[in-house]
Amino acid sequence: MSKVIGIDLGTTNSCIAIMDGSQPRVVENAEGARTTPSIVAFTDDERLVGQPAKRQAVTNPDNTIFGVKRLIGRRNDDAALAKDKKNLPFAVIDGGNGDAWVEAKGEKYSPSQISAFILGKMKETAESYLGEDVTQAVITVPAYFNDAQRQATKDAGKIAGLEVLRIINEPTAAALAYGLDKEQTQTIAVYDLGGGTFDVTILEIDDGLFEVKSTNGDTFLGGEDFDMRIVNYLADTFKKEHSVDLTQDKMALQRLKEAAEKAKIELSSSSQTEINQPFISMGSNGQPLHMVMKLTRSKLESLVGDLIKASLKPCKDALKDAGLSASDIDEIVLVGGMTRMPKVVEEVTKFFGKEPHKGVNPDEVVAMGAAIQAGVLQGDVKDVVLLDVTPLSLGIETLGGVFTRLIDRNTTIPTKKSQIFSTAEDNQNAVTIRVFQGEREMAADNKILGAFNLENIPPAPRGMPQIEVTFDIDANGIVSVGAMDKGTGKEQKITIQASGGLSDEDIEKMVKDAEENADADKARRELIEAKNQAESLIHSTEKSLEEHSDKVDPTTVEAIELAIAALKDEMESENADKIKSGIQNVTEAAMKLGEAIYNASQEENDDVAEPADGPHDDQDDIVDAEFEDLDNDKRA
C-alpha cells in the first residue's frame, strides 16, 4: 500500500510531509527547498510551478498566478474580493457560473485548477522521494473555510490525481504535530496567521485525544494584506516625489510586491532595511527613475497595526465560545510565516498574558500534522483521536427570510441533526430547502450553500405536513442535507455543492487536461534530457577526435563526423526519439575511435621493456636510513 501524504496547501507557500517511522518528515522539493511557493505561471510553451514560476513573475506579471487560495470557493461578486482585484496583476474574471476564476494566456482557469497544479508539484515531490506512485492525501484548509471552499479544495485534489482522504483544519493539524508526544493534559491556543488567512483554535490535548473546543478566524487576513500595505506606502511615496503612479504599471507593481515581501521578512530580524529598485519607471522627459527608500520596523508596525489588532477579536470570540479566559490557556502555538513578525508575537503575548511556545517551525508544522493524520488513517499512528468542529452555524431559510440554525458553530464533527418543519400555505405541494452557513439572523446575510426541492406533498392545510430536514456533516466538514415528508416517506437528499462550483463534468474535464499536461510535461523533460545528453556526447566525441584522429583511418573519422552532423540536425527537430537515435549512431561510430585509442595505449605500454639482465636482488647499493625516535612530548 502506497504512502498517504500530508499537504499544507498554503496561500503563499505549500509544504509536504510523510510519516517516517513514528515521526513526521518534511520532504524537500526538486529545488532542494522544504517549502514550495504557491505560484503557477504560464509562458508561451510551458507551465511553471513553484520557484521557477516565482523567478519570472516580474517579466510575466499578467500570466503569473499567486494567492489563489483567497479566491477558491468564492463568488466573483464577493465584496471581500473587490479590494484584492485592483491590486492583482493578473485578471480575475467570472467563470461563467458566478465563481471567481483567473485568466492567463487567453485561457480561463478555476482556482481549484490552479491549486491542482500546485498539488501536482507536491505529488511529484513525494513520488520522487518515495520512489513509488502516490494516490492518496490529507490536505489542510483554514479552520474558518466554509463548505464551498472545502469542497473546492477537495476538487483540486481530485484534478491533481489525488484521492483526498481527509480535509483537516490547519490549526488542528498544527496541534497534532505539537502534541503528538505530549502526555499531560493541556489546553492550547493555536494562533495561525499565514499568507492569506487567519485562524485561532482552542484545543484540549489529553494523552492522544485532541478535542477542538472552538475555532474562529478571518479568511481574508494574512501576509498578503501586510505586503499590500507596504506596496501602497512605497507607491504613494514615489508618486509624491516623482508624480508617477507605479500601481498602473503591472511589472512595477510586481517588483514592488517582491520588494515589500523581502523588506517585511528582513524587518523581523533588523530595525531598518533599504528598498532599492533601479529603473522602476520613466519620468515625463524620458529619464529613468529609481526607487531608493529606507523602511524602519516602527514604520512597518504603524502601517499594519490595525491588521494585527484585527486578529485579536477572533481570539476573544474563540475563548468566549470555549467558555474559557486567556489565563486558562496553558500554551500558545504560533503557526504561519507572519508569526515571525516581532509585533505579532508582542500582541499575542500581551493578549494571552504569556510567551508563545517556540518549539515548532511555523512554516512546516501544519504539513507535519497533516502527515500525522495521514498516518492515523493508514493505521501507522496509533492512540491518536482527533475531534474537530464545524466553524460556522448551518441552517435553512424559514418563513420571513429568517435563518433557522440546525447545527451551531463549534459543534464536534462528524455530526447529524434533524428538525421538523411544515408548509407555509394551504395545499402547498412542494417546498424549497435553501441551505445557509453563517452567524447572521437573516438568511440573506449568510453564505448560501445550495437549494433543492421536495415535491409531490399531498394537499393539506398549512402547518399540517411534517417535513423532516436532516443535516449531516462528515469528518471533512462537508455538508449533506436531506428532507423527507413524514406522511408519504418521500425523500430528497443532496451533498451541498457551491451555487456555481464545479460540476462533475467540469472536474472530469480538468482531470483529463491535467493528465494530458502531465504527458506533455514528461515529453518536454525527455526532450531536454535527450538534448543535454546529445550536447555532452558531441562535445566529448569532437574533443577525442581532435586529439586522436591520427590513430584511426580517414574513413572512420569521416563516419564519426557525419554521425555528429546528423545528430546536430536532429537536435533542431524537437523530437526526442530522433535525438536518441542520433545519440546511438554517434556512440556506435565513436566506438572504433575508442578501440583505436585503447590499442595505441596498449602498444605504448608493451614498448616499455625490462632491463636485459632481468630483475636481480643485489642489495649492495641499499643504504640503511638512520632515524631518531622522539619522545611523545616533543612530537608535533
Swiss-Prot record:
- Pfam families assigned: HSP70
Return the Basic and acidic residues bias intervals: 540-552
Q: Does the keyword Chaperone apply?
A: yes
Induction details: By stress conditions e.g. heat shock.
Q: List residues modified as Phosphothreonine.
A: T197
Compositional bias, Acidic residues, is annotated for 618-636
Which GO molecular function entries does the Swiss-Prot or TrEMBL record give? Answer: ATP binding; ATP-dependent protein folding chaperone; unfolded protein binding
This protein's UniProt keywords: ATP-binding, Chaperone, Nucleotide-binding, Phosphoprotein, Stress response
Q: Where is this region: Disordered?
A: 533-552, 595-636
| UniProt xrefs under Gene3D superfamilies | 1.20.1270.10, 3.30.420.40, Actin, Chain A, domain 4 (3.90.640.10), Substrate Binding Domain Of DNAk, Chain A, domain 1 (2.60.34.10)
Looking up InterPro entries in the UniProt record yields: ATPase_NBD (IPR043129), Chaperone_DnaK (IPR012725), Heat_shock_70_CS (IPR018181), HSP70_C_sf (IPR029048), HSP70_peptide-bd_sf (IPR029047), Hsp_70_fam (IPR013126)
Protein family (similarity comment): Belongs to the heat shock protein 70 family.
Q: What does this protein do?
A: Acts as a chaperone.
Report the protein name in the record: Chaperone protein DnaK
Organism expressing this protein natively: Roseobacter denitrificans (strain ATCC 33942 / OCh 114) (Erythrobacter sp. (strain OCh 114))
Identify the coding gene.
Answer: dnaK
